Each structure stands twice: as structure tokens, then as C-alpha cells.
């Protein structure tokens, strides 16, 4: 059953849907989550080839090896979808989301430390890049998919998804230029350290969503 209550209206107005959704703490946390995870996703997709090139890989090798991020990300989306369908207690999909994102934080700190070396270990960096894809894209895929229906239901799914994706695209637009500019001034090691903070905030937002789902289930 959906969390949003639109009253007895069969086709609630857009303003009714918006007010109802914004009044839900879980939905507000989901907006923060969407903004940050789309920002992180965009940094990886736009800038991973440049990052690998800057730390010493050849141009063609950097482009090819950067594919490990979305490739393992596919596995992450399949895993979290299967797991939450079969094992999420009381419909709390956010629990697995914050658990996966907490591992993402560790992966990004590891990339930051490894890329600061004068002789980077490329195999380890690629391992953590792939792991980042798995642990980021899985939770990311939940924001405008399953969680939309869990929160807004069929009546409000379109508006709910539009707002969530809109917030995400703002984060993606910022990432498209900010990460490259930061790397020029601070270096990639510092960029990934900053991104790990964003990942930590994403983890916290998913944790608060999980707490919200648990409280509703117990009510």
C-alpha cells in the first residue's frame, strides 16, 4: 500500500499530489538522495576516462577500462531489485540501499588514497571503480522506480518521478562541470575525497528513509 494519502479523489490534482508528497519526510529524504546519487553517477560516467588518463593510463585503455563502472552497476541494479523483492522486511527497501552506499563510501576513500600515489596500482583502482558501480547504481535505480510506487502509488507516480528526476538532473548538471574543474585545482585524490562525503550524506538520507519505513510499519 502506498504511503501518500490523496483523500477520496479518484484523480487528484497536481497540486494535491505535490502537497501530499512534500509533506512526507520520506519523500523529502528521497529528493536529497536523488540529487546526490545522480551527481555521483554523473561524475563517474563523465569523468572516469579522464581520471584514468590523468593518473597514467593511455587514452584508449582509459576509455575501455572505464566501462567496468556501468558494467558492474548493471549487476548492482539486478541484485538490489531481487533482494528487496524477496527479503525487504515491511517493504523497507531503503535498508539495503544505505548498506550498499556505506560500502560505496569506503570504495571512494580507497580510490582517493590509491590515486594519490606516485605509482598508482591500476588493478586495485579498477577494482574499486567497479565496486563503486555495483554499490552506487543499485541504490540509485530504486529512487525513481520501486520507491516511487511505494510512496506515491499509481495515482501520483508520474508527478513523483518527475520531481525526483528533476532534482537528480540538477545534481547531474553540477557534476558535469564541477568535478573536472575541481580536479584541475585540487587533483583527483581530493575530488574523490569530496565525493566520499557526498556518498556519506546519501547513505544518511537512505538510513533516514529506512527508519521512516520501519516506523510506519510499526504504527
Regions inferred by a protein language model and the residue ranges of each:
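Juxtamembrane intracellular "pre-TM" segments in multi-pass secondary transporters
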Residues: 1-30
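Hydrophobic core of transmembrane alpha-helices in multi-pass small-molecule transporters
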Residues: 121-142, 146
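Helix-to-loop junctions at the C-terminal end of transmembrane segments
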Residues: 77-91, 183-184
Amino acid at each position: 500500500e502506498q504511503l501518500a494519502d490523496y483523500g477520496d479523489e479518484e484523480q487528484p490534482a497536481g497540486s494535491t499530489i505535490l502537497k501530499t508528497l512534500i509533506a512526507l519526510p520520506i519523500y523529502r529524504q528521497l529528493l536529497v538522495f536523488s540529487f546526490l546519487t545522480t551527481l555521483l553517477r554523473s561524475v563517474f560516467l563523465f569523468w572516469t576516462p579522464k581520471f584514468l588518463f590523468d593518473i597514467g593510463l593511455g587514452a584508449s585503455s582509459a576509455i575501455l577500462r572505464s566501462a567496468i563502472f556501468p558494467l558492474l552497476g548493471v549487476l548492482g541494479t539486478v541484485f538490489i531489485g531481487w533482494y528487496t523483492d524477496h527479503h525487504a522486511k515491511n517493504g523497507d527497501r531503503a535498508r539495503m540501499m544505505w548498506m550498499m552506499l556505506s560500502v560505496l563510501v569506503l570504495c571512494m576513500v580507497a580510490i582517493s588514497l590509491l590515486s594519490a600515489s606516485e605509482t598508482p596500482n591500476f588493478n586495485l583502482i579498477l577494482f574499486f571503480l567497479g565496486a563503486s558501480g555495483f554499490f552506487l547504481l543499485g541504490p540509485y535505480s530504486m529512487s525513481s522506480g520501486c520507491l516511487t510506487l511505494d510512496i506515491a502509488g499509481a495515482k501520483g507516480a508520474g508527478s513523483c518521478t518527475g520531481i525526483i528526476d528533476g532534482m537528480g538532473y540538477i545534481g547531474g548538471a553540477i557534476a558535469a562541470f564541477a568535478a573536472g574543474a575541481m580536479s584541475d585545482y585540487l587533483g583527483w585524490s581530493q575530488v574523490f575525497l569530496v565525493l566520499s562525503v557526498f556518498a556519506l550524506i546519501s547513505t544518511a538520507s537512505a538510513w533516514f528513509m529506512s527508519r521512516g519505513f520501519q516506523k510506519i510499519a510499526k504504527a
